[in-house]
């Protein structure tokens, strides 16, 4: 059985995702498509616009055969930990043959070579990286500049025809991180990539293949929902229509964050991504702000990107400060939490029961993992801003079978 893994958020699922699924099946000759999907909070550091169960159903209705939840300790982390959590999960299942991801690059050669450099970390590259970090640049910017300088230097033995701009594009960065994780884990899973079609990741203009950002922006701007009819699969359109009064946005968590900070300021510095006094800057900014946008504007600087600050705030909302999340996200994913499957997915699960080195979780009350406890708390937190979600849904909701 040729099982292909994909890693996605489907926030929400759109035509570009359908293109990815179709091309993946064609390129990988897949018998089964397994999706590791972020839960109720996504890598941008925001609540998902629609809950994880509904998004899993849309995925299973649109070409995915099995959906497994990526624990939020990974989904609410940098690209490196996000990728490591998802790839380690796929690797531990024991029967996944390949993964396929979308990228702006569209070819594996350069992505894989750059991944190898970043895993090996040659001395010359590390020295340049340190210089940029010392100048106050964010890690992503420092790494991009350091890699470009390293590739241009006579010290580099790699192909000088490499695309040096790979690390300037969001999906390329994730692709590099997926490959880095495969290399570190000494995995036998083979990576494939397809060229991303349509809007760039952060583009806000609606097109035939629109980015998830553009779709969310249109919904938040209260545009007529009919404008999305041809931007998303029918199941997603129906899902959005049915949930139009319970869609979630990052602004909704602001008051909860502000109250928590005002009553327990010291807990901010217990978050895994907090350093260099950013917790004090966040606290002082909160005193002056009345919404998330103004808070982000006041807090962002050269070292701390918008996404990193957004993740810190959402981690705080969920309660990352109560767990040793730094240790959790540096460890391979310890379990596979099943959200839903179809007939093909059912056969894949039978295969995983023979080969997996981690438990396949269908009932959360049977297991005691810190990462799982954090996910249960994430659902409780999400229920505060999405009234269609019960805080105990992780215990009561049945696995989706289509």
UniProtKB/Swiss-Prot annotation:
GO terms for cellular component: cytoplasm. It catalyses: cytidine(34) in elongator tRNA(Met) + acetate + ATP = N(4)-acetylcytidine(34) in elongator tRNA(Met) + AMP + diphosphate. One of its GO terms (biological process) is tRNA modification. It is found in: Cytoplasm. Belongs to the TmcAL family. Catalyzes the formation of N(4)-acetylcytidine (ac(4)C) at the wobble position of elongator tRNA(Met), using acetate and ATP as substrates. First activates an acetate ion to form acetyladenylate (Ac-AMP) and then transfers the acetyl group to tRNA to form ac(4)C34. This is tRNA(Met) cytidine acetate ligase. The gene is tmcAL.
């Amino acid at each position: 059985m040729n099982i292909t893994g994909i890693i996605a958020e489907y926030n929400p699922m759109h035509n570009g995702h359908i293109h990815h699924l179709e091309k993946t099946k064609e390129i990988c000759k897949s018998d089964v498509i397994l999706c590791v999907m972020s839960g109720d909070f996504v890598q941008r550091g925001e609540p998902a616009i629609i809950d994880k169960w509904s998004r899993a159903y849309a995925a299973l209705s649109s070409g995915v055969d099995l959906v497994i939840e990526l624990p939020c300790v990974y989904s609410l982390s940098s690209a490196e930990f996000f990728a490591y959590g998802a790839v380690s999960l796929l690797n531990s299942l024991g029967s996944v043959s390949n993964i396929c991801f979308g990228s702006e690059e569209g070819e594996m050669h350069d992505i894989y070579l750059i991944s190898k450099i970043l895993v090996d970390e040659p001395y010359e590259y590390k020295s340049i990286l340190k210089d940029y970090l010392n100048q106050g640049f964010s890690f992503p910017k420092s790494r991009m500049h350091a890699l470009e300088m390293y590739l241009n230097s006579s010290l580099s033995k790699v192909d000088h025809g490499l695309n040096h701009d790979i690390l300037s594009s969001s999906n390329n960065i994730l692709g590099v991180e997926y490959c880095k994780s495969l290399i570190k884990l000494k995995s036998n899973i083979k990576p494939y990539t397809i060229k991303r079609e349509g809007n760039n990741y952060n583009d806000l203009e609606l097109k035939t293949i629109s980015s998830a950002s553009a779709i969310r922006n249109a919904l938040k701007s209260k545009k007529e929902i009919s404008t999305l009819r041809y931007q998303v699969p029918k199941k997603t359109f129906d899902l959005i229509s049915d949930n139009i009064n319970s869609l979630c946005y990052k602004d909704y968590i602001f008051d909860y964050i502000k109250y928590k900070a005002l009553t327990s300021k010291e807990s901010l510095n217990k978050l895994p991504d907090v350093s260099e006094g950013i917790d004090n800057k966040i606290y002082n900014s909160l005193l002056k702000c009345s919404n998330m946008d103004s808070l982000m504007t006041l807090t962002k600087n050269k070292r701390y990107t918008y996404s990193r600050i957004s993740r810190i705030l959402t981690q705080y909302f969920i309660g990352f400060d109560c767990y040793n999340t730094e240790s959790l996200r540096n460890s391979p994913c310890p379990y596979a939490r099943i959200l839903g499957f179809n007939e093909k997915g059912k056969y894949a699960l039978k295969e995983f029961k023979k080969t997996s080195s981690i438990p396949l979780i269908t009932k959360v009350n049977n297991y005691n993992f810190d990462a799982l406890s954090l996910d249960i708390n994430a659902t409780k937190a999400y229920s505060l801003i999405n009234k269609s979600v019960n805080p105990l849904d992780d215990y009561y909701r049945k696995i989706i079978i289509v």
